[in-house]
Protein backbone atom coordinates (compact mmCIF):
# COMPACT_ATOMS: atom_id res chain seq x y z
CA UNK A 1 0.00 0.00 0.00
CA UNK A 2 1.16 3.52 -0.79
CA UNK A 3 0.26 6.50 1.39
CA UNK A 4 0.55 10.13 0.26
CA UNK A 5 0.63 12.96 2.81
CA UNK A 6 0.95 16.73 2.53
CA UNK A 7 2.89 19.20 4.67
CA UNK A 8 3.39 22.95 4.71
CA UNK A 9 7.12 22.45 5.20
CA UNK A 10 9.82 20.01 6.35
CA UNK A 11 13.56 20.32 6.86
CA UNK A 12 15.16 21.07 3.51
CA UNK A 13 17.57 18.12 3.70
CA UNK A 14 14.59 15.73 3.70
CA UNK A 15 13.44 16.90 0.25
CA UNK A 16 14.74 14.28 -2.20
CA UNK A 17 12.32 14.78 -5.11
CA UNK A 18 10.54 17.53 -7.00
CA UNK A 19 7.29 16.96 -8.89
CA UNK A 20 5.87 19.61 -11.19
CA UNK A 21 2.21 19.75 -12.19
CA UNK A 22 2.11 21.78 -15.41
CA UNK A 23 -0.37 23.43 -17.70
CA UNK A 24 -0.04 25.23 -21.00
CA UNK A 25 -2.86 27.28 -22.51
CA UNK A 26 -5.34 25.71 -20.09
CA UNK A 27 -4.32 22.12 -20.86
CA UNK A 28 -2.57 19.62 -18.60
CA UNK A 29 1.02 18.79 -19.59
CA UNK A 30 2.00 15.12 -19.36
CA UNK A 31 5.11 13.20 -20.37
CA UNK A 32 5.32 9.75 -21.92
CA UNK A 33 8.53 7.88 -21.08
CA UNK A 34 10.27 6.05 -23.94
CA UNK A 35 10.05 2.72 -22.08
CA UNK A 36 6.45 2.95 -20.84
CA UNK A 37 2.94 3.27 -22.26
CA UNK A 38 1.74 5.49 -19.43
CA UNK A 39 1.69 9.20 -18.64
CA UNK A 40 3.22 11.20 -15.82
CA UNK A 41 3.86 14.75 -14.71
CA UNK A 42 7.48 15.85 -14.75
CA UNK A 43 9.70 15.31 -11.75
CA UNK A 44 12.78 13.62 -10.44
CA UNK A 45 15.58 13.27 -7.93
CA UNK A 46 17.41 16.15 -6.32
CA UNK A 47 21.12 16.21 -7.13
CA UNK A 48 23.74 16.66 -4.39
CA UNK A 49 24.03 20.29 -3.34
CA UNK A 50 21.12 21.36 -5.55
CA UNK A 51 18.44 23.78 -4.34
CA UNK A 52 15.11 21.93 -4.47
CA UNK A 53 13.43 24.63 -6.60
CA UNK A 54 16.34 24.33 -9.05
CA UNK A 55 15.64 20.58 -9.14
CA UNK A 56 12.06 21.37 -10.12
CA UNK A 57 13.14 23.79 -12.86
CA UNK A 58 15.74 21.36 -14.22
CA UNK A 59 13.35 18.42 -14.30
CA UNK A 60 10.62 20.52 -15.93
CA UNK A 61 13.01 21.65 -18.66
CA UNK A 62 14.54 18.21 -19.21
CA UNK A 63 11.30 16.25 -19.31
CA UNK A 64 8.90 18.65 -21.02
CA UNK A 65 11.27 20.79 -23.07
CA UNK A 66 9.87 23.90 -21.36
CA UNK A 67 11.76 27.02 -22.44
CA UNK A 68 9.55 29.76 -21.04
CA UNK A 69 7.62 29.06 -17.87
CA UNK A 70 6.62 30.33 -14.46
CA UNK A 71 7.05 27.86 -11.60
CA UNK A 72 5.81 28.12 -8.02
CA UNK A 73 6.04 25.79 -5.03
CA UNK A 74 2.72 24.41 -3.77
CA UNK A 75 3.59 22.28 -0.74
CA UNK A 76 5.69 19.40 0.51
CA UNK A 77 4.41 15.87 -0.05
CA UNK A 78 5.55 12.50 1.19
CA UNK A 79 5.09 8.98 -0.08
CA UNK A 80 5.31 5.94 2.17
CA UNK A 81 5.36 2.49 0.60
CA UNK A 82 7.27 0.63 -2.07
CA UNK A 83 7.19 2.31 -5.48
CA UNK A 84 9.13 2.34 -8.73
CA UNK A 85 11.58 4.84 -7.18
CA UNK A 86 11.55 3.61 -3.55
CA UNK A 87 12.20 -0.07 -2.92
CA UNK A 88 12.47 0.27 0.89
CA UNK A 89 8.98 1.65 1.45
CA UNK A 90 10.22 4.31 3.89
CA UNK A 91 8.64 7.77 3.89
CA UNK A 92 10.27 10.01 1.28
CA UNK A 93 9.66 13.73 0.85
CA UNK A 94 9.43 15.98 -2.17
CA UNK A 95 8.46 19.48 -3.21
CA UNK A 96 5.27 19.76 -5.24
CA UNK A 97 5.26 22.68 -7.69
CA UNK A 98 3.00 24.14 -10.34
CA UNK A 99 4.27 25.52 -13.65
CA UNK A 100 2.58 27.44 -16.42
CA UNK A 101 4.53 26.74 -19.62
CA UNK A 102 4.34 29.29 -22.44
CA UNK A 103 7.00 27.89 -24.79
CA UNK A 104 8.40 24.42 -25.50
CA UNK A 105 11.57 23.32 -27.29
CA UNK A 106 11.02 21.70 -30.68
CA UNK A 107 12.75 18.46 -29.56
CA UNK A 108 13.13 16.55 -26.29
CA UNK A 109 16.57 15.42 -25.17
CA UNK A 110 15.66 13.17 -22.26
CA UNK A 111 14.17 9.80 -21.38
CA UNK A 112 10.79 11.13 -22.44
CA UNK A 113 9.39 10.12 -25.82
CA UNK A 114 6.89 12.93 -26.05
CA UNK A 115 4.93 15.62 -24.25
CA UNK A 116 1.15 15.60 -24.55
CA UNK A 117 -1.28 18.42 -23.77
CA UNK A 118 -4.60 17.08 -22.45
CA UNK A 119 -7.97 18.62 -21.61
CA UNK A 120 -8.62 15.86 -19.07
CA UNK A 121 -6.38 13.82 -16.79
CA UNK A 122 -5.11 10.54 -18.28
CA UNK A 123 -6.49 7.13 -17.43
CA UNK A 124 -3.16 5.32 -17.80
CA UNK A 125 -0.84 6.82 -15.16
CA UNK A 126 2.75 5.76 -14.54
CA UNK A 127 2.24 6.42 -10.82
CA UNK A 128 -1.53 5.86 -10.35
CA UNK A 129 -1.38 5.74 -6.55
CA UNK A 130 0.59 8.98 -6.25
CA UNK A 131 0.26 11.56 -9.01
CA UNK A 132 -3.57 11.78 -9.13
CA UNK A 133 -3.46 12.59 -5.39
CA UNK A 134 -0.86 15.31 -5.98
CA UNK A 135 -3.06 16.92 -8.64
CA UNK A 136 -6.16 16.59 -6.45
CA UNK A 137 -4.33 18.38 -3.63
CA UNK A 138 -3.22 21.17 -5.99
CA UNK A 139 -6.80 21.61 -7.22
CA UNK A 140 -8.22 21.58 -3.67
CA UNK A 141 -5.80 24.29 -2.55
CA UNK A 142 -6.92 26.54 -5.44
CA UNK A 143 -3.59 28.37 -5.39
CA UNK A 144 -2.88 28.64 -9.12
Regions found by a protein language model. Give the residues of each.
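Short connector loops at helix/strand junctions that flank enzyme active sites
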Residues: 15-17, 23, 34-36, 41, ...
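Conserved Nudix-box catalytic region and its N-terminal flanking loop in Nudix hydrolases
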Residues: 23-62
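Class I (Rossmann-like) S-adenosyl-L-methionine-dependent methyltransferase catalytic domain
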Residues: 5-10, 77-84, 91, 134, ...
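Active-site beta-strand termini and strand-to-loop segments that position acidic
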Residues: 22-25, 99-101
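Acidic, metal-coordinating catalytic segment for phosphate/diphosphate chemistry
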Residues: 1-19
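Unchanged
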Residues: 46-70, 78-133
Amino acid sequence: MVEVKFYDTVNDELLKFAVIISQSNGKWVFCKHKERDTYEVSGGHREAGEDILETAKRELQEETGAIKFEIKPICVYSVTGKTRVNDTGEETFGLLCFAEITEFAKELHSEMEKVVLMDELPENWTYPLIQPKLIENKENLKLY
